[in-house]
Amino acid sequence: MAIKLEDKKAIVAEVNEAAKAALSAVVADARGVTVGAMTGLRKEAREAGVYVRVVRNTLLKRAVEGTQYDVLNDAFVGPTLIAFSKEHPGAAARIFKEFAKGQEKFEIKAAAFEGKYLAANEIDVLASLPTRDEAIAKLMSVIQGATSKLARTLAAIRDQKEAAAA
């Protein structure tokens, strides 16, 4: 079915805005995935702040032109499902990776992060990035461990001086 020129321009503009605001992008082939499964994927993506859209390849190439995601042009072959992470760089990769475990026909093609192309086998790097809260928790545990070690050392020195004075 042919799409009107105005509709094509609107799609390109919408995807371009999503690309400009995104932290990372993941491209997949969803051929053979049921409508119910895709609906669940879209719902999960929406909740995680991920923009998901099926777009024609020619429109997608125009939409990402001039953005950090034009490195993905070679991955725009066949039916293309693209996801842009708006809040966390690894969100789209994590969602697609989890979804692919239950759907054997769902194939992740590639990803892009900070203008760098990541092949499908490298997507684990992006998916394993800690969320902001996880990173803060790790940092706080490191800081807390260092301060408690310092406090124990100071207490040991104090105890040694008290023992020597007694």
From Swiss-Prot:
Q: What GO biological process, any one, is recorded here?
A: translation
Picking any one GO molecular function of the record gives:
large ribosomal subunit rRNA binding
The UniProt entry, under SUPFAM superfamilies, shows: Ribosomal protein L10-like
PANTHER family for this protein: 39S RIBOSOMAL PROTEIN L10, MITOCHONDRIAL
Family listed: Belongs to the universal ribosomal protein uL10 family.
GO terms under cellular component: large ribosomal subunit
Give the function comment from the record.
Answer: Forms part of the ribosomal stalk, playing a central role in the interaction of the ribosome with GTP-bound translation factors.
Q: Specify the species.
A: Pseudomonas fluorescens (strain ATCC BAA-477 / NRRL B-23932 / Pf-5)
The subunit structure is: Part of the ribosomal stalk of the 50S ribosomal subunit. The N-terminus interacts with L11 and the large rRNA to form the base of the stalk. The C-terminus forms an elongated spine to which L12 dimers bind in a sequential fashion forming a multimeric L10(L12)X complex.
Q: Which gene encodes it?
A: rplJ
| Keywords for the protein's UniProt record, in alphabetical order | Ribonucleoprotein, Ribosomal protein, RNA-binding, rRNA-binding
Short name of one Pfam family: Ribosomal_L10
Q: What is this protein called?
A: Large ribosomal subunit protein uL10
